[in-house]
Swiss-Prot record:
Compartment(s): Cell inner membrane
Function: Cell wall formation. Catalyzes the transfer of a GlcNAc subunit on undecaprenyl-pyrophosphoryl-MurNAc-pentapeptide (lipid intermediate I) to form undecaprenyl-pyrophosphoryl-MurNAc-(pentapeptide)GlcNAc (lipid intermediate II).
EC number per UniProt: 2.4.1.227
Molecular-function GO term, any one: UDP-N-acetyl-D-glucosamine:N-acetylmuramoyl-L-alanyl-D-glutamyl-meso-2,6-diaminopimelyl-D-alanyl-D-alanine-diphosphoundecaprenol 4-beta-N-acetylglucosaminlytransferase activity
Record protein name field: UDP-N-acetylglucosamine--N-acetylmuramyl-(pentapeptide) pyrophosphoryl-undecaprenol N-acetylglucosamine transferase
Record keywords: Cell cycle, Cell division, Cell inner membrane, Cell membrane, Cell shape, Cell wall biogenesis/degradation, Glycosyltransferase, Membrane, Peptidoglycan synthesis, Transferase
Amino acid sequence: MTNKKVVVLVAGGTGGHLFPAEALAVELRQRGYDVHLATDERAKRFVRHFDEKHIHIISSATLVRHHPFALIKTFWLLLRGMVQSWILFRKLRPVLVGGFGGYPTVPPVWVAALTGRVTFIHEQNAVMGRANRVLATRVNAIASGLLLENKIHIHKTFVTGNPVREAILKAAEIPYCASTSKQPFYFLVFGGSQGASAFSRIVPEAVKLLDHDIRERLHIVQQVRGEEIDLAKIYQDMGVQAEVAPFFDNMVEHIARSHFIMSRAGASTVCEIAIIGRPALLIPYPHALDHDQAANAALLAARGGAQIMLEKDLNAQILSSLLTKFCCEPHSLEQRALAAKKVGKPQATRVLADMAEALIVGRSLLDMKREFFDENTT
């Protein structure tokens, strides 16, 4: 039986929710804590830093309105998850419970708060997600990745940033170097399953409109869906160097090497681009819940580190004009790269762990603001 203090982190079973939880877990273990993960079945595909005995599956479900039978099932699963959470906490006796978004966080964090345990939530996006909104009034602190100031919760909201991979921090040491008129211009295009199809249609049309001398310089790295892999042949026929694939193991290297990026605006993407310091054209996913990607993009654009364009407004002519401009005026991209880097928060994992330890020892919220988060004080 370990004598270490136990911390339970709770996250929905997708990479976006799990990664910051895992990053914090690694840091807290180095500080001597025994860290457990409460999540749902989906997490098994993504978890890297928890062994089986430290993973606890909790029942939950996404709230579905206007469907009575689905609503009944959802409430039953939430109730079951609350009972499971209560039993788990009785066994582990955690000194801290932290939620990282997604509906699976609701039962454990709710029960933890209800039973008087110290709690926090971490919001990755500039707009608070639905599960975190349910929990915001009940927790002791709200850690902000990109979250815009919310006057209702300002007294307990702390800007920590979003934890990123160690590879991102290493890539951040590589300075941005503008592409001169005789050098290749690296253009990175990615958007996951939510962006690949739209980008695969627009980018080659834009490339066709470029002058020959610019096409000769262009080196495209583009994420596509599996059925769109023949895009490589289209670029080849236009005389453009291109790497096309559904997934890149070395995506961090591609971000660091790029002169210009076109991507969606998920929280992790925006944070990684900012920390490495690369200029971007951000196209928010139009069907994102609560328009969180638009808010994420707006935060970086407001500091001059990115340009936003709605998908409905993007066409081949506009993209072609942008590529021509940036190939001919590389120093404007240098300025955007510097602006993006100023937004990045490479110390996010450490700051989040500092906040967690402050909560554990009972530090007041005001003291925590003064010491760690002066930039969030109004």
